[in-house]
Every structure is written in structure tokens, then in C-alpha cells.
Amino acid sequence: MISFIGYYNYTVILTYISLFCSIAGMLFTVNGWYKMAVLCLALSGLCDMFDGKIARRKTDRTDDEKCFGIQIDSLCDMVCFGAFPILLAYSLGMRGPIGIVILAWYGMNGVVRLGYFNVCETKRQEETEEVRKYYSGLPITSIAVVLPLVFVLHTVLRNHFAVALHVAMFVVGTLFVTNIQVKKPRN
């Protein structure tokens, strides 16, 4: 019988569904089906909103399962809310030198934000069982709300859509690593 590495239980299922949605969204993006891609990004964000809450309901998780959950969540977040939005924004018009620099800035800050979160969350879970109340910096998942809103506005913005997209990606990427406290939404 074949066995697989990793942990496969209900605590990570929404994380994997989120990843599936984002991979589908990337494929929609490269085929020019932007409405479907944006929908996939929003669905991925919705899954990510609840994955931690579901994981915390399993009270008998081992330390390895908890650590795996932190790591797999961040790895999936980098694909879902890092790489996927970069591909989508590039395809929607951020193709010049300024756009490419902004997208690289966004991606770099996404990685830094997730790495910092992993270190802090691992330490926090060793010290307390309490649910986190605040994030340091804007969570990377926020792009699943911001980018669809900017996309919906493209019919209104028309000639200014590219500017709005550039500004949104730069501001959101910067807020990932800005030392601000962001209240965690209650699910």
C-alpha cells in the first residue's frame, strides 16, 4: 500500500480547497477568463478566512500537526495570495517597468510577511492557547478582497483602471510589512 507524507484530515481541507481555487484561477488568468479568475481569488480568500477556525476545533492535534498547519497554510497563502494576484495583475495590465517593480515588491513583501508570521505564530502557540486578536501588518489574504473590488471598478474607472491597479498592489504590498496592528475579523 502507498503512503503519503503530510497530514490529511479535516483541519487542512479548506487550505487545500483554497489552493485548488487559486490554481484554477491562475489557469483562468492565462486563458484570459478574468471574471472567473477573480471569482476564484475571492473563493480562495473565503476558504482561508475559516481554515484556522476549523483547525482549532480539533483539540487533540499533536505539536507536529499544529506546526504542519502553520507551514502549509503559509505555503498555500503564498501561492493563493502572492503568486496568483501577481499573475492576475500582470495579465490585467501591469506590464511595464513600473508595474513589474511593483509586482516584485508585492511578492517580496508577501514572502517576508508570511515568514515573519510563521516565526511569531509558532512562538505564540508555544506560549498560549488563546486565539490571536491582532495581526502585525496587513494579512496577505486581504488581496482577496482588494483585487476583486478594483476589478469590479474597472468598468467605472476605464482609463484609470491601470493606475488604480498599480496603486492597489503597491499599497497592499507595503502594508504587508508595515508595523501596524490589524484587528483580526471575527469569523
Model-derived features: positions:
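Cytosolic, membrane-interface loops and tails of multi-pass inner-membrane proteins
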Residues: 1, 50-67, 117-133
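Membrane-water interface of alpha-helical transmembrane segments
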Residues: 1, 5-15, 31, 35, ...
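Topogenic membrane-insertion module of multi-pass membrane proteins
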Residues: 1-52, 175-187
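C-terminal membrane-associated helical module and adjoining short loops/tails
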Residues: 2, 125-187
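Multi-pass membrane catalytic core of lipid/isoprenoid biosynthesis enzymes
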Residues: 11-16, 57-114
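Lipid-exposed faces of alpha-helical membrane segments in multi-pass integral membrane proteins
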Residues: 14-20, 40-43, 79-82, 101-108, ...
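Helix-coil boundary and interhelical linker segments in multi-pass alpha-helical membrane proteins
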Residues: 24-39, 79, 83-104, 149-165
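Transmembrane alpha-helical segments that form the membrane-embedded catalytic/substrate-channel core
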Residues: 48, 107-120, 170-185
